């Protein structure tokens, strides 16, 4: 059996058509976060909890964690999952003696936002942040204690029972130290989608505050798309970016067509110029009869208008071979529509992906 050649970062392949906002200080029982409510956000959310995805550079521990989680990836997770995480963290905060505000992955849970993929921050204990390095050296049975010298009262919100939580912008920025750029991008988009912050607030924080891993935050901001409607859509878009496939619009409303009730027909990702649409199908797309029929009708209508609609499932994002096959499929469709080969790279480091996107925006 012949040995496989070593793949180098950034190696190009050619695919042609013949190849396949602030937290309120009072508890609103009907609002978000048991008192971490934001006034201008809708009172519902149904998104998937994020799970780690296998990528180059993973350690053995990362791979084992991924394999343990694989069976759960195919289960549809509703808003209840976020509420359960929040309730567990909330109760732990009540019972613990904490030297500082809740931060990092614990604050993500308190904000009722999906956790990012591939983060080194674990949830077996609470995470808190202090400004005094002497406090960070004290062993705590209840929490991991982090030190951030830039912490002050502007960054802390309080619940009615006196629990301090880092605001959304500080939470996102401090997560950068233990999170890859793709996970940081996904976390930022989730916070924006749930109304916890805005892209401009995140950018202002990065530009005006002092903390570690600013370059990683700038890269994540470059890759961010506030129109993304779910974590899986973000993962799908970033997968294509990593293989050098650009030009996709998130949550694209197709002009000239709508459902019978007048609702716009949207695509998770779309290349409007070439009429290529990509739809992420979670388990509810096949288990819900109404949803399945609605999806089938939508795709028939789009195909009659010349669109090519590609369905994506968790399997397509589950590991690098499946991600590569998905990217090659999209590249082949583009090549067929353009009538010429399409250059496809092997997975690029996120720094290079962000740099390329910045260059394209300047053109």
Language-model region placement:
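Short gly/ser-rich loop at a beta-strand->alpha-helix junction or flexible surface loop bordering the NTP-binding
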Residues: 1-210, 335-363
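Surface segments flanking catalytic/ligand-binding clefts of nucleic-acid enzymes
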Residues: 192-363
